[in-house]
UniProtKB/Swiss-Prot annotation:
Species in which this protein is naturally found: Campylobacter jejuni subsp. jejuni serotype O:6 (strain 81116 / NCTC 11828)
PROSITE patterns: CARBAMOYLTRANSFERASE
UniProt family annotation: Belongs to the aspartate/ornithine carbamoyltransferase superfamily. OTCase family.
Entry-linked PANTHER family: ORNITHINE CARBAMOYLTRANSFERASE, MITOCHONDRIAL (PTHR45753), ORNITHINE TRANSCARBAMYLASE, MITOCHONDRIAL (PTHR45753:SF3)
Annotated positions binding carbamoyl phosphate: 46-49, 73, 97, 124-127, 260-261, 288
Gene3D superfamilies, alphabetized: Aspartate/ornithine carbamoyltransferase
Enzyme class: transferase
Gene Ontology terms: biological process: arginine biosynthetic process via ornithine; arginine catabolic process to ornithine; citrulline biosynthetic process
Name of this chain's protein: Ornithine carbamoyltransferase
Catalysis performed (reactions): carbamoyl phosphate + L-ornithine = L-citrulline + phosphate + H(+)
Pathway: Amino-acid degradation; L-arginine degradation via ADI pathway; carbamoyl phosphate from L-arginine: step 2/2
Entry keywords, A to Z: Arginine metabolism, Cytoplasm, Transferase
Length: 306
């Protein structure tokens, strides 16, 4: 069964097809999943992700069932595989936002319904699909190639972008603090994909080096959910990594800024630059709705072929 746990499991053609279908559904909504049911399991808070999934399945003609971790027997120690074997037989899709990626993998092993990663500590693939749709809409993909810089933490967003850039053949530069590292296993995967796609991938600790000649600039919060106790330390470590006017001036003249939100002005991005690119950033957030629609349709079609 096809799940959506990481973009590593998807081909270039499948990723681009998802983005193109999302664009079509944005222009012409259709009820393609009449009476289908989506279970939404959250171990972490969510604003945009919950809204995107709940609206997506509803507008496609189905219905959503919201389940926080406190609503489930998982919170009392029931094995993940047992929960998966119950929920996965009652619904058509399962969306999960989890603390540990292993929870997703375990759930997917036992679920009879496709499982979607709505965020884990390693990956945030639905967000990257929304980013790709936004890049397409702002005409920052020329001949199938985008020039992208990611500035910030070597987190789930960085990992997901590294993977998709390598698969799609993008020019992609990462800038992270000196004591931060990319997962060796994810980096190895990306390098192998880059040999196939022709992607140009670089890693540095200098944001200006990464930003040079880029059309798309991506940043993310320095303090992810669950890292609140590390805030003071991380702010010190990320000193100099803010995206401000000086940083954006190094990128190409009409470069756009993307941020998955929530944004913390004065830390990863300046107030001035955030507001300057607010139209793009909030359309990026809105685009999550349409890529989720396309994803649900894709998984439903894949399941129908089995």
């Amino acid at each position: 069964m096809k799940h959506f746990l990481t973009l590593r499991d998807f081909s270039k053609e499948e990723i681009l097809s998802l983005v193109n279908h999302a664009s079509e559904l944005k222009k012409e909504p259709k009820k393609l999943l009449q009476d289908k049911t989506l279970a939404m399991i959250f171990e972490k808070n969510s604003t945009r992700t919950r809204m995107a999934f709940e609206l997506a399945i509803t507008e496609l003609g189905g219905k959503a069932l919201f389940l926080s971790s406190n609503d489930l027997q998982l919170s009392r120690g029931e094995p993940v595989k047992d929960t998966a074997r119950v929920i996965g037989t009652m619904v058509d899709f399962v969306m999960m936002r989890v603390n540990k990626h292993e929870t997703l993998l375990e759930f997917a092993r036992y679920s009879k319904a496709p499982v979607i990663n709505a965020l884990s500590e390693f990956y945030h693939p639905t967000q990257v699909l929304g980013d790709l749709l936004t890049i397409k809409e702002w005409n920052k993909m020329q001949n199938g190639i985008a020039k992208v810089a990611f500035i910030g933490d070597s987190n789930n967003m960085c990992n997901s972008w590294l993977i998709v850039a390598a698969i799609l053949g993008f020019e992609f530069s990462i800038a992270i603090p000196k004591n931060y590292k990319i997962s060796p296993e994810i980096w190895e995967f990306a390098m192998k994909q880059a040999l196939i796609s022709g992607a140009k991938i670089s890693l540095s600790h200098d944001k200006f080096e990464a930003l040079k000649d880029k059309d798309v600039v991506i940043t993310d919060t320095w303090v992810s959910m669950g890292e609140e106790n590390e805030k003071e330390r991380k702010i010190k470590e990320f000193e100099g990594f803010m995206i401000d006017e000086k940083a954006m001036s190094v990128a190409n003249k009409d470069a756009i800024l993307l941020h998955c939100l929530p944004a913390y002005r004065g830390y990863e991005v300046s107030e001035e630059i955030f507001e300057k690119h607010a139209d793009v950033i909030f359309e990026e957030a809105r685009n999550r709705l349409y890529v989720v629609k396309a994803l649900l349709c894709f998984l439903d079609n894949q399941r129908g072929r089995e």
